[in-house]
A protein has these predicted regions:
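Conserved class I S-adenosyl-L-methionine
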Residues: 69-79
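Conserved SAM/SAH-binding beta-strand->alpha-helix loop
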Residues: 105
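Class I SAM-dependent methyltransferase Rossmann-like catalytic core
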Residues: 29-56, 63
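Conserved SAM-binding loop of SAM-dependent methyltransferases across substrates and taxa
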Residues: 80-94
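C-terminal lobe and adjacent flexible extensions of AdoMet/dcAdoMet transferase-like proteins
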Residues: 239-345
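A short SAM/SAH-binding and catalytic strip from SAM-dependent methyltransferases
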Residues: 144-158
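Conserved beta-strand signature within the Rossmann-like core of class I S-adenosyl-L-methionine
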Residues: 170-179
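N-terminal auxiliary segments of SAM/dcSAM-dependent transferases
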Residues: 1-28
């Protein structure tokens, strides 16, 4: 398969694609006018999505969670197939029986299948069809591991029903979206709707209702930040792309949700004991202290962390490299002691 390069990119086509992405579902129709559109997208915009998947998969690894073996992997709303390829690369193709691709665009499915076969020779790759509420619903082969990436702003009512049908037959859902308030709130709504059937693996440290649904947290949302690959910010081609696309490559916000069907595995790999919290995006760092949104089973609270109480965490917050999973002790609205998460063994 012929790949794109910085020398061959069609910048006009990338500008058009960027505008279509911003318009979302209101744009209608197919993004792609040619195979070259998909190749250029995969070389640029999709790489940024890949960094988000790297962050999510890295966290799952730190928690000790891995995908259950012997199941098909479905990349639903696959686009150029970045999400499915990242998952295959991370867990290994031998963990899955096949890769199944679905997208409303036939051209996207063909491109994604070619890229997958190129990267993973011998992997069985299938295209899922269907229309309306049956779109992308697998016909058999076992309960799948379902990956969903950047689809919420494109889904109409029929697409939402179709996705829910696939979720209802899946054993695992790994879902990544942009870190906007709207996308985060939509994922929270899905989390609440699915809590009876699924265990929430991540980003949450608990199984209680989402603390962001309270009136006092109405302006907050659950988002996180992925890091670009080392050295990328010194790469002139990527800098030019970021400027042209209006994207800050230093800040890669995302929201995500990982679910596993209740009773599938006991004990659940990566399950956290009680008492752990998650630091959400939106940290504000000042001289000598920081304000953090801390999510735990008892709710989401805006807390103060003084540098003298946790100098290592304060330094990591300042550099944007803090471990989000922490065990926090507090007095009122102040964190007095922290313990970063480290997987035992």
């Amino acid at each position: 398969m012929k790949s794109s390069s910085w020398q061959t990119l069609d910048w006009g086509a990338l500008d058009r694609l960027r505008q279509r992405f911003l318009e979302g579902a209101s744009a209608g129709g197919d993004y792609w006018t040619s195979r070259a559109d998909l190749a250029d997208y995969d070389f640029t915009f999709a790489q940024r999505i890949g960094w988000k998947w790297d962050a999510v998969l890295g966290e799952l690894q730190r928690r000790g969670w891995t995908a259950p073996a012997g199941r098909p992997l479905i990349d639903w709303g696959c686009g150029s197939g970045m999400a499915g390829r990242r998952v295959l690369e991370f867990f290994g193709m031998d963990r899955f029986t096949r890769l199944q691709l679905f997208d409303r665009s036939a051209a996207a499915m063909e491109f994604a299948s070619e890229k997958a076969r190129e990267m993973f020779p011998g992997m069985r790759v299938e295209l899922l069809g269907g229309a309306g509420p049956e779109a992308g619903v697998p016909g058999g082969g076992g309960a799948p591991v379902l990956v969903v990436s950047h689809v919420l702003n494109e889904l109409d009512e029929a697409g939402g029903r179709a996705l829910r049908q696939v979720i209802d037959v899946a054993d695992v859902v790994v879902w990544v979206e942009p870190g906007t308030s709207a996308d985060s709130r939509a994922l929270i709504a899905m989390r609440e709707a699915l809590r009876e059937q699924f265990v929430v693996v991540a980003p949450c440290t608990h199984q209680a209702g989402c603390g962001l649904l309270t009136a006092e947290n109405a302006r907050q949302w659950c988002h996180h930040f992925a890091a670009p690959p080392p050295g990328l910010l010194a790469d002139g081609d990527w800098v030019r792309f970021g400027q042209r696309a209006g994207i800050d490559l230093r800040s890669v916000p995302y929201s995500f949700l990982v679910l596993e069907r209740r009773g599938l595995r006991s004990p659940l790999p990566g399950a956290l004991p009680e008492g752990w919290s998650r630091l959400l995006g939106g940290t504000r760092v000042y001289k000598g202290y920081a304000k953090v949104f801390c999510c735990a089973a008892e709710g989401v609270h805006d807390l103060m962390l003084q540098k003298r109480d946790a100098p290592e965490l304060f330094k990591a917050l300042k550099s944007g490299e803090a471990e989000p999973l922490q065990r926090c002790e507090r007095e009122g609205g102040r964190i007095t002691k922290v313990q970063p998460f480290r997987q035992e063994g």
